[in-house]
């Protein structure tokens, strides 16, 4: 569980990034066309990329720290889609 998630949102392209921790980027694993998880070389999660969160909402399945991510997204009125495939 992490309490220091930082959400950045670019309205012009409807894209969000949630920073989990500051570290050098090593690789990204795409969960689907709208979601990717960024990792450091040690395998720790450093961020979450979300495309079209305002237009399509955000699925939590497969995301790390789903409770914290949900709270951050709902705080800026993004629709959270739990249990949807």
Language-model features: where?
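Small, basic N-terminal interaction modules of short regulatory proteins
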Residues: 1-85
